Amino acid sequence: MARIKRGTATHARHKKVLKLAKGYRGRAKNCYRIALQRVEKALQYAYRDRRNRKRDFRGLWIIRINAAAREHGLTYGRFMHGLKLVGVDLNRKILAEMAVNHKDDFAKLIETVSSKLAENS
């Protein structure tokens, strides 16, 4: 039976890892064993932070909506409650976009919500 050498496969695997480790500091960029550890850790961070990014953006949208609502005399919580009462079904991403880039439309929304809240209380 012929001997099978696996040098080609090993070389390709090493090359793939070292390509992913491009730009790393020290031996992590050119020493396979260290590069492999760093690349695996980088992939773990990437996986974790893809999930954290969703949390971070939601927090950012809430901060922006709260700031814009407070300019008009409402808190974030009362504003969101008012939106539910009025029946406006806009998500936080769109509301934050309106608060930053379409201030006049957001102000009209605040007026509608304020009148509904005053009517209900």
Swiss-Prot record:
GO terms for cellular component: ribonucleoprotein complex; ribosome. GO terms for biological process: ribosomal large subunit assembly; translation. Keywords: Ribonucleoprotein, Ribosomal protein, RNA-binding, rRNA-binding. Gene3D superfamilies: 6.10.160.10, Ribosomal protein L20. It comes from the Bacteria. One of its GO terms (molecular function) is structural constituent of ribosome. Pfam families: Ribosomal_L20 (PF00453). Belongs to the bacterial ribosomal protein bL20 family. PANTHER family: 39S RIBOSOMAL PROTEIN L20 (PTHR10986). Binds directly to 23S ribosomal RNA and is necessary for the in vitro assembly process of the 50S ribosomal subunit. It is not involved in the protein synthesizing functions of that subunit. This is Large ribosomal subunit protein bL20. It comes from Wolbachia pipientis subsp. Culex pipiens (strain wPip). The gene is rplT.
